[in-house]
A protein has these predicted regions:
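Hydrophobic targeting/anchoring helices
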Residues: 287, 292-471, 555-589, 600-615, ...
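The substrate-binding groove and active-site-proximal loops of carbohydrate-active enzymes
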Residues: 23-34, 57-72, 130-150, 254-272, ...
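A short, well-structured beta->alpha microelement
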Residues: 38, 312-315, 475-495
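Polysaccharide-binding and catalytic clefts of secreted carbohydrate-active enzymes
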Residues: 105-321, 327-330, 338, 344
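Short acidic, Pro/Gly- and aromatic-enriched capping/linker segments at domain boundaries
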Residues: 1-14, 198-205, 597-613
Length: 731
């Protein structure tokens, strides 16, 4: 049996196959569609001919007894197809363990109440509509879970014991929920599951959370007549489908605790399912097969707790999970983009887990046309030259951050059926392989921190926290700074201590022991900490202890919200901040009353008009900044970075990722560009095969979408890496 592991080397997660450190570059061929398997087989063959020997296939695992053998047969067919063309192939098996369609409907017949049900399917009398439309078994069903775990164990055991296939499967990618990605099925369109199975799960969750203590339950919920058997999902659900209105931003009242506990369940249930399936794979394979899953899409999903993706810390700390995955961020991925990650990527690396980038960037190739084909809305690459520049950008990012990737023909259409594409991928794979022993972890000077447990208390992220997460992420990627993304727990644990500037996206939970831990980070010498929007239910003393400033709340009149709009003042007068002027309404607003060093901006409208919404406090060797809006734009972020003394590596707007040994750059707009290095050093311009000796910057005039990989340090040491000479782009 082949053995595969993810292990740290120089602090970086590395893929080992049979004890050989291997560049983690895969090709995913979509094996879901029988009528396109001939295309996928051609792509497998072409990839192997160009030196790619890591592959991924996909299938739906049937959990019912009568479905199990067909699932085994399907994977066997896919492996046979692949091994015909590459006897050395090593395979990542992507397998969906959930139950859909006819299988789910059949399950419902014997297990009523275990299909996903949406809030809109509930009648006024509390009963489910007879004609409710659902196509998935609820992930809250315990009977389904047990059956799926048994099926997965039998499935994995078959291939572990197979005389041929056991030598080729190196990883299982456990998928479920919507599109394998562990979102709650249809949550963006229909909302969250309120089925009988979900109701039962919530009662069990609440009982466990409060230790079965009725007194604790009643104190938390503010009801002295409440018992555990009375617990049910409270409807309407704040933020369901992302847009349900709710009078306040933060859920802090006793009568709102049921919503908080339900939001928590939505994520912890998904995490616990993944952990259970991962444990099975590790046990059956004796720990010698890699396990990964889709999870942690905090930024792409706009901070929405209804997604189920906010129990990431549980999975980061799970010894049975080796890695995580997501597609490249969809909204900034093409030529001139940054290819942003959806997750707290630097926490992943800090836990020595590997992030697998699903590189499903659409190419301009199709093997054959089909009825109904239209231009893909996410496609923006129409020639080899542009495609290569994006591939080089992605490869550089992955090398610096220790990530794996699979190049993905999402639907088996022949996106990769051209030898020139495989030549390029093979050259990048050889480069990655040569750098593996030499790269050390990325060292951010700016830390972006999100507390996932506090996301459970956000009534609706749409139009508020979504700006903080989704929008600001893309701005952070374009600042020309060394920016890292972390979980709140990892920040408190010291995993972001290299940063001199920290953005706390939702500091509402920094109370008690957590607050004391935060103070140790905030009060470090040379540290600047930025608090975004507000402080939940903290009192004045708690807010002042964190920030050094006196802050207060401005509550909106009943049935209304307050607009977040500011005008700049003092030394910042005249600044133009489009983001702060965005039409965002929220309740409450927070403002600074006193004990500040400098005010930067004041609110301009409504009850908060004239009150300070943006200010700084210089303290004994450190400084704090409060910003009462939800999104800081590029100019303000750079102003703050300069106040903090953060090193700037280049022009704002371009993508620049500066690692300890190498830097990747990709231009957003044409023009003269200067990149700065952390010190005077020798620089190898890899794609140009050119050396610059003893420099601290390089200036070039460039077109849009040009990628450069700079490797820096001592020329003698870098030449000792024995890097393959870049042969130039194939076409």
């Amino acid at each position: 049996m082949v053995k595969a592991h993810v292990r740290p080397v120089n602090g970086m997660p590395r893929l080992f196959i049979d004890e050989q450190m291997t560049a983690p570059v895969f090709f995913y061929g979509c094996t879901l569609f029988e009528h396109r398997l001939d295309i996928v087989e051609r792509e497998f063959k072409m990839a192997a001919q160009h030196g790619i020997h890591l592959f991924s296939v996909i299938l739906k695992m049937g959990a019912m007894p009568e479905e199990r053998q067909p699932s085994i047969d399907n994977l066997s067919r896919y492996l046979d197809m692949l091994l015909r063309h590459d006897p050395a192939a090593k395979v990542l098996v992507r397998i969906n363990v959930c139950q859909y369609g006819s299988s789910a409907r059949k399950w419902e017949e014997s297990h009523p109440g275990e299909m996903v049900v949406y809030e809109a399917d509930i009648q006024d009398d509390g009963e489910v509509k007879a004609d409710f439309d659902s196509t998935m078994t609820s992930v809250f069903s315990e009977d389904w879970r047990k059956m799926a775990e048994e099926a997965l164990e039998a499935f994995v055991r078959y291939f572990v014991e197979h005389p041929v296939y056991a030598d080729h499967i190196v990883a299982y990618h456990i998928g479920g929920g919507e599109s394998d990605e562990w979102f709650h099925f249809g949550y963006r369109e229909g909302g969250c599951d309120v089925s009988a199975a979900a109701q039962k799960a919530l009662r069990a969750h609440v009982q466990a959370k409060y230790g079965g203590d009725v007194a604790r339950l009643r104190a938390a919920y503010g009801r002295d007549d409440l018992n555990f058997e009375d617990i049910s999902i409270a409807m309407p659900i704040p933020g369901n489908t992302g847009r349900n209105p709710y009078p306040t931003y933060y859920l802090s009242k006793p009568e709102e605790q049921i919503h908080v506990d339900y939001n928590e369940l939505l994520s912890t249930r998904i995490a616990d399912l993944i952990k259970g399936f991962a444990r099975i794979v590790k046990r059956v394979t004796n720990g010698d097969t890699i396990v990964l899953c889709f999870y942690g899409y905090w930024y792409e999903l706009g901070g929405d707790s209804k997604s189920g993706h906010f129990a990431f810390q549980r999975l980061l700390e799970c010894p049975d999970i080796d890695g995580f995955s997501s597609p490249i961020g969809y909204w900034d991925r093409d030529l001139g983009g940054t290819g942003p990650y959806m997750c707290a990527i630097d926490s992943v690396v800090a836990h020595h887990k590997m992030w697998f980038v699903e590189n499903d960037i659409r190419t301009f190739l199709l093997y054959r046309r089909e009825p109904g084909d239209t231009r893909d809305g996410f496609q923006n690459l129409y020639n080899f030259e542009d495609l290569y520049e994006v591939y080089k950008r992605e490869a550089g990012t992955q090398m610096i951050r220790g990530c794996a990737s699979w190049y993905m023909d999402l639907a088996g259409r022949g996106w990769f059926y051209h030898p020139a594409i495989w030549e390029q991928i093979h050259h990048l794979e050889r480069l990655y392989d040569a750098t593996l022993p030499h790269i050390t972890p990325f060292v951010p000077e700016v830390a972006v921190v999100l507390d996932e447990e506090e996301v459970y208390r956000i009534a609706s992220a749409h139009g508020t926290f979504g700006y903080t997460t989704f929008n600001m992420r893309m701005t952070f990627y374009r600042l020309g700074l060394a920016v890292g993304f972390y979980t709140g727990d990892d920040w408190l644990a010291g995993k972001a201590d290299s940063a001199k500037l920290t953005f706390l996206l939702n500091p509402t939970g920094l109370k008690g022991a957590k607050g004391e831990g935060a103070l140790e980070k905030i009060r470090r010498q040379g540290q600047t900490t930025v608090f975004i929007y507000g402080f939940g239910d903290m009192d004045t003393a708690q807010m002042q202890r964190l920030t050094g400033m006196t802050l207060a709340r401005c509550e909106a009149p009943a049935g209304t919200k307050l607009p977040v709009q500011m005008v700049f003042c003092g030394s910042w007068e005249g600044c133009k901040n489009v983001s702060a002027g965005r039409e965002v309404d929220v309740n409450p607003l927070f403002y600074v009353q006193g004990d500040y060093t400098e005010a930067f901006a004041q609110y301009t409208i409504g009850e908060a008009a004239g009150k300070i919404g943006f200010a700084m406090k210089r303290q004994d060797g450190y400084q704090t900044i409060f910003f009462g809006g939800f999104e800081l734009d590029r100019d303000l972020l750079l102003r703050i970075a300069r106040l903090a003394g953060v090193r700037e590596y280049g022009y704002f707007g371009d993508y620049i990722l500066p690692g300890p040994q190498m830097m990747i750059t990709h231009t957003t707009e044409p023009g003269e560009k200067t990149v700065h290095f952390p010190r005077v050093c020798d620089v190898y311009d890899y794609y140009e095969n050119r050396w610059y000796e003893q420099v601290d910057r390089i200036t070039k005039t460039l077109d849009k979408g040009k990628t450069f990989l700079y490797i820096y340090g001592s020329r003698r040491e870098i030449e000792g890496w024995n890097l393959p000479v870049w042969p130039g782009d194939p076409i």
